[in-house]
């Protein structure tokens, strides 16, 4: 099954790589129109997933991620149109020049080829990833979670029908709809056809892909993000940054998970923070000095464990650690961080520069919320994932991250001397 799927995707990628921007945009426009026109059918299939989720007693938060409404579906169609408006990176000349030999050489952006994406309970990802891959001339094989099997199946049908209307191969976008996990393992070994694997989910999914894939894997998405409040920080402004970083949308990978506070201001600052967040239902996890201060401030607090310091909560839980100085803060981040997003709140330019230079992360912030680590916020237009690794792409992965490049060399029957 997957061998055939891989071959079809590879053949489709060959055709996609030759398309003009206008041809790709036309296909995306038809996809957006079909999402709107087929909304009743899509929502009916999504309702089946929701009913099964309730029968299986999935959490309210997970069911909410699964749910498609007329408004959300319209938002997905609008997102596809937004991708149309983005600049096409394929064919862009990165750099080049003429060598002493007279050979003209240019480095030109090209599609990667075939992308494999494994993700969990978010049907919107099906369209997000498909549209970004199509814009960059890549074919894609999608494998969503079993919780979205009905939604994904109908969404793929809509996309494939739209591709055929545009005169393009429908196998440019395919999905593994069988929930058998063995098929995931087979996809990870399909290196003859698939050029990159992008997992979108929790740490277990990323570890599975890293351990078993024979295809390059984009590692990321798991964010144990820290914010360090240094003693010179404007405390009132710092509280609003922390509020935003923790409570705006707790389930995201760029949410603050561990707050580091300098010892010299902890007794003054933490009670202010607790008071400000009192209506937000934040549960604190702390030890030693931080635990005592938070208890006295009347916070909902329990003792933090070593495992929790490495945990991406994805909720309104917040670890709080009191540290002696910036050196201790950076050391804590080195030990527990996931190289996603780290922030310092300070009035010292020297300490800010030290933090930037010494903290190893995809995004490092000075006096700002970690919530900005996002393709749209970074001006990339859209993202397929957030990478925390260092090879190929790092941070929010926009359209350019779905491309490679080739060296194009032109001569006048030029030979090497």
From Swiss-Prot:
Cellular component GO terms held in the UniProt record: cytoplasm
Compartment(s) of residence: Cytoplasm
Xref: Pfam families: Aldedh
Primary location: cytoplasm
Keywords (A to Z) from UniProt: Amino-acid biosynthesis, Cytoplasm, NADP, Oxidoreductase, Proline biosynthesis
Gene Ontology MF terms in the entry: glutamate-5-semialdehyde dehydrogenase activity; NADP binding
GO process terms (BP): L-proline biosynthetic process
Catalysis performed (reactions): L-glutamate 5-semialdehyde + phosphate + NADP(+) = L-glutamyl 5-phosphate + NADPH + H(+)
Pathway in which the depicted protein is active: Amino-acid biosynthesis; L-proline biosynthesis; L-glutamate 5-semialdehyde from L-glutamate: step 2/2
EC numbers, comma separated: 1.2.1.41
Matches recorded under InterPro entries: Ald_DH/histidinol_DH, Ald_DH_C, Ald_DH_N, Aldehyde_DH_dom, G-glutamylP_reductase_CS, Glu-5-SA_DH, GPR_dom
Stated family: Belongs to the gamma-glutamyl phosphate reductase family.
Its job: Catalyzes the NADPH-dependent reduction of L-glutamate 5-phosphate into L-glutamate 5-semialdehyde and phosphate. The product spontaneously undergoes cyclization to form 1-pyrroline-5-carboxylate.
Protein name, UniProt field: Gamma-glutamyl phosphate reductase
